[in-house]
Amino acid sequence: MAENQYYGTGRRKSSAARVFIKPGSGNIVVNKRSLDEYFGRPTSRMVVKQPLELVELTEKLDLYVTVKGGGISGQAGAIRHGITRALMEYDESLRPALRAAGYVTRDARCVERKKVGLRKARRRPQFSKR
């Protein structure tokens, strides 16, 4: 591995992303595919690029990402979290800006479990008065 490579792990819902950052030309590879190829939705691509655009390093760093589990939205969020952590390892002075934007905090929201006697997590069976 290259000596000037920075790593960050990101998680969101049931997705986990491993992000490797190194100086380059702004190339982003997700699971051996380009960002545009991997994420069809423009929203997901925007979410992934947010931390880089905030610190204005979009054209200066190459990203290699592997992501597993969950769906498209969760994976995009996990990659964003991983990029944020890798950027902080790359340059600690970026932390306040990333923190202010809310990218450092892990979004702890996940699916609530189904309870016994209910149809879903909170949906009760229909009540019949008589």
From Swiss-Prot:
Taxonomic lineage from the root: Bacteria, Pseudomonadati, Pseudomonadota, Gammaproteobacteria, Vibrionales
Keyword Ribosomal protein: yes
UniProt xrefs under PANTHER family: RIBOSOMAL PROTEIN S9 (PTHR21569), SMALL RIBOSOMAL SUBUNIT PROTEIN US9M (PTHR21569:SF1)
The protein's name in its UniProt record: Small ribosomal subunit protein uS9
A GO MF term: RNA binding
One annotated Gene Ontology cellular component of this protein: cytosolic small ribosomal subunit
GO biological process, one term: translation
Family, as annotated: Belongs to the universal ribosomal protein uS9 family.
Keyword Ribosomal protein: yes
Domain of life: Bacteria
InterPro entries: Ribosomal_Su5_D2-typ_SF, Ribosomal_uS9, Ribosomal_uS9_bac/plastid, Ribosomal_uS9_CS, Ribsml_uS5_D2-typ_fold_subgr
UniProt source species: Vibrio parahaemolyticus serotype O3:K6 (strain RIMD 2210633)
HAMAP family, alphabetized: Ribosomal_uS9_B
Keywords recorded for this protein, A-Z: Ribonucleoprotein, Ribosomal protein
